[in-house]
């Protein structure tokens, strides 16, 4: 057994998973958790992996990418998924848990491991030596300042302002056209043209749609210079036509005329399978959000892989800063995990902790860190956060649009998803003993 100790900062979903993966590989872990010495605005207990929002870990079937990532994690002996399975409550095709039992179970498994030492204190400086930073979206101000200094001000963010993302295959290409404004540069946007009547219907639905209530600690977000589309709309219908939906320079090649309004879609991934809706960061609830977006011509049947969100979230610009091993590019023994890396969601956070933990253990044992291939769900997430366009980087959930394309195109969605899942699980089995 190596005598080197790995510091893990934060005992949330990612930190707990990372600590467990390091410890089970025979490496000593010093797990720092500032609760209960110092609480966050969202936590209520001193337990590890406390779920601060929903008690659902989302879909549990292999027809959904988050179901595939769970199954990969089961095969890799994830402590988070094991605890979730043991504390599950009825939820149809989803994996939901008794949140108190779940947190208690994770705490028990991690705390009682002989290679884990828990230290209840706030870390305000990044330690020397092998370290995994997994402090989550509510990282304390002092450590945030240190991370900002480490990564550079331009690469450290305090909130999400993410527009919705749709699958290209679900866009009605007969209703949209490829064009850049005034034909500058290459045609880079798919444009959804609207008549005045279509815009009016969209506008009325948008201003009437239900929004997510803001938590107290999130209320400063909108003063940071990034306005939700529904707030812009509430200032008057022309605000959108002169803002994110302005049609000037975007004549419709089918008619030769300028539409009344245009919604632009921008490619979001290297493979060209995902498109984001430009300027549509929003605080709408997901149900109403889908109804409003499907009023946009060409998006009537859009498959939304990530809904627009705006919430408090401390995260780094991973494409500029991290390798797909979750290592910091400027310091081999420093790893990041969890929502801080730009993965979005409980399961995705734990999955990043699993891989960061494995690689931290391998590093101190003198072994090569592992990069999971993007045909796997975990590998596709690591690839997305480290290889996507750094300029427009925003956090992302697991979805099949991030997976490496299938060798053979499959038209039916259910069969295509099944093929993604089968290939992912066949591949991950080669890594279960790393």
Curated annotation (Swiss-Prot):
Name the Gene Ontology biological process terms: tRNA methylation; tRNA wobble uridine modification
Function of the molecule: Catalyzes the folate-dependent formation of 5-methyl-uridine at position 54 (M-5-U54) in all tRNAs.
Question: Subcellular localization, per the record?
Answer: Cytoplasm
Q: Which organism is it from?
A: Bacillus cereus (strain AH187)
Sorted alphabetically, the Gene Ontology cellular component annotations on this record are: cytosol
What Pfam family is a match for this entry?
Answer: GIDA
From the broadest rank down, the organism's phylogenetic lineage runs: Bacteria, Bacillati, Bacillota, Bacilli, Bacillales
What this protein catalyses is: uridine(54) in tRNA + (6R)-5,10-methylene-5,6,7,8-tetrahydrofolate + NADH + H(+) = 5-methyluridine(54) in tRNA + (6S)-5,6,7,8-tetrahydrofolate + NAD(+); uridine(54) in tRNA + (6R)-5,10-methylene-5,6,7,8-tetrahydrofolate + NADPH + H(+) = 5-methyluridine(54) in tRNA + (6S)-5,6,7,8-tetrahydrofolate + NADP(+)
Record carries keyword Cytoplasm: yes
UniProt: FAD binding residues: 10-15
The protein's name: Methylenetetrahydrofolate--tRNA-(uracil-5-)-methyltransferase TrmFO
Instruction: Name the keywords, alphabetized.
Output: Cytoplasm, FAD, Flavoprotein, Methyltransferase, NAD, NADP, Transferase, tRNA processing
- PROSITE patterns found in the cross-reference section: GIDA_2
Cofactor(s) for this UniProt protein: FAD
């Amino acid at each position: 057994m190596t005598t080197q100790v790995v510091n893990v900062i934060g005992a949330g979903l990612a930190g707990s998973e990372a600590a467990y993966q390091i410890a089970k590989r025979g490496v000593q872990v010093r797990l720092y958790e500032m609760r209960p010495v110092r609480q966050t605005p969202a936590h209520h207990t001193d337990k590890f992996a406390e779920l601060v929002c929903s008690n659902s870990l989302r879909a549990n079937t292999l027809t959904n990418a988050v179901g595939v990532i769970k199954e990969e994690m089961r095969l890799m002996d994830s402590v988070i998924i094991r605890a979730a399975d043991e504390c599950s409550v009825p939820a149809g095709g989803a994996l939901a848990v008794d949140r108190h039992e779940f947190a208690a179970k994770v705490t028990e498994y991690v705390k009682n491991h002989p290679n884990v030492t828990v230290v209840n204190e706030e870390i305000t400086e990044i330690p020397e030596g092998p370290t995994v930073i997994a402090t989550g979206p509510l990282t304390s101000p002092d450590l945030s300042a240190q991370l900002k200094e480490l990564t550079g001000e331009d690469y450290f963010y305090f909130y999400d302002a993410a527009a919705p993302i749709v699958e290209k295959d679900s866009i009605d290409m007969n209703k949209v056209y490829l064009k850049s404004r005034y034909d500058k540069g290459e045609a880079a946007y798919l444009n959804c043209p609207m008549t005045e009547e279509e815009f009016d219907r969209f506008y009325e639905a948008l201003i009437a749609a239900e929004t997510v209530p803001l938590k107290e600690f999130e209320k400063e977000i909108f003063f940071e210079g990034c306005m939700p589309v529904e707030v812009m709309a509430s200032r008057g219908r022309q605000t959108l036509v002169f803002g994110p939906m302005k049609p000037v320079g975007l004549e419709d090649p089918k008619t030769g005329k300028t539409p009344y309004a245009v919604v632009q879609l921008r490619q979001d991934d290297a493979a060209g399978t995902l498109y984001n809706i430009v300027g549509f960061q929003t605080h709408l609830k997901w149900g109403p959000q889908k109804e409003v977006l499907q009023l946009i011509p060409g998006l009537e049947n859009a498959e939304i892989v990530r809904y627009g969100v705006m919430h408090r979230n401390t995260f780094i610009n991973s494409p500029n800063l991290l390798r797909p091993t979750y290592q910091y590019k400027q310091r081999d023994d420093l790893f990041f995990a969890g929502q801080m890396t730009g993965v979005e969601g409980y399961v995705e956070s734990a999955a990043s902790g699993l891989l960061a933990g494995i690689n931290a253990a391998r590093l101190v044992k003198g072994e090569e860190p592992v990069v999971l291939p993007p045909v796997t769900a975990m590998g596709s997430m690591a690839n997305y956060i480290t290889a996507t366009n750094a300029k427009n980087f925003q956090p992302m959930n697991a979805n099949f649009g991030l997976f490496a394309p299938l060798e053979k195109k499959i038209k039916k969605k259910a069969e295509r998803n099944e093929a993604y899942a089968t290939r992912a699980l066949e591949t991950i089995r080669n890594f279960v003993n790393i």
